[in-house]
């Protein structure tokens, strides 16, 4: 069984063949210190790990998306760029920017499967020379069907045609680890930690393994799927896994628990130990 959308992932061999393409924009999502120590030649450092939104009402959401558009432009991304994103493994940092770009209407985006570790382990060139890009002309064309807001989640609660996926850790899901004003879970959410998407070496699991894993939890392609975590990083990884499988209706909840758990007017449940 193969992925429904295999083009979303690039192998290190594919990247090696295209790394000098003039239209390629390679974005290193790791912390700046990791980038400065060693990175793939021509990669541009783009650490946005600390940038999140905990209020997805229309006005703050619009301002946040405008900021993200300008940050992406600043890394030299053009409307016709072929973008490849990576972190140490095929992880949540690269997944989140992948989701942003798809949401912004940019289809030419890929995740480096296995990440920087796979590139280095293959013996391919690495460098410490920083890439300083010129600004790009990237313009967002948001696809509303790729994002979920707090109002969307509220509207979809307990609908049999929608499944909310909690991609956080066991402790966060049960409320033992509280990273907001309130701990717990969105009522009815199905818990499946994002790390289950990966094998032991940091590559995405096979299509057959992913399909079985999600089907066993009744997360199926006929449903609208809304993943969330704390800040839409880990849930973006779930988004990518489901996109690889060809799920047609997946929407990442941008505010995630950082929004839901900090409000006092939203329903919360406290699941038992998984």
Could you tell me what each predicted segment is?
Residues 1-274:
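Cytosolic catalytic domains that perform sulfur/thiol-centered chemistry
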């Amino acid at each position: 069984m193969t992925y429904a959308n295999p083009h979303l992932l690039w192998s290190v061999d594919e990247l090696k063949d295209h790394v000098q393409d003039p239209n390629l924009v390679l974005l290193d999502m790791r912390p700046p210190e990791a980038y400065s120590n060693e990175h793939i030649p021509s990669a541009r450092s783009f650490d946005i790990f600390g940038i999140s939104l905990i209020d997805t009402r229309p006005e703050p959401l619009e301002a946040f998306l405008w900021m993200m558009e300008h940050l992406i432009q600043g890394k030299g991304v053009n409307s016709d760029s072929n973008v490849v994103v990576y972190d140490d493994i095929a992880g949540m940092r690269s997944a989140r920017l992948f989701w942003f770009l798809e949401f912004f209407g940019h289809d030419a985006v890929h995740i480096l499967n296995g990440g920087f570790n796979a590139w280095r382990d293959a013996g391919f060139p690495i460098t410490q020379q920083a890439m300083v890009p010129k600004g790009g002309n990237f313009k967002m064309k948001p696809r509303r069907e790729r994002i979920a807001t707090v109002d969307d989640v509220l509207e979809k609660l307990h609908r049999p045609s929608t499944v909310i996926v909690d991609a956080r850790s066991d402790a966060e899901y049960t409320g033992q680890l509280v990273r907001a004003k309130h701990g717990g879970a969105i009522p009815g959410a199905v818990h499946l930690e994002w790390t289950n998407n990966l094998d032991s070496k940091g590559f995405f699991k096979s299509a057959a393994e992913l399909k079985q894993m999600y089907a066993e939890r009744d997360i199926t392609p006929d449903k609208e799927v809304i993943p969330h975590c704390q800040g839409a990083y880990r849930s973006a990884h779930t988004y990518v896994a489901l996109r690889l499988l060809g799920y047609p209706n997946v929407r990442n909840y941008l505010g995630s628990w950082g929004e839901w758990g900090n409000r006092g007017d939203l329903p919360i449940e406290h699941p038992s130990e998984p």
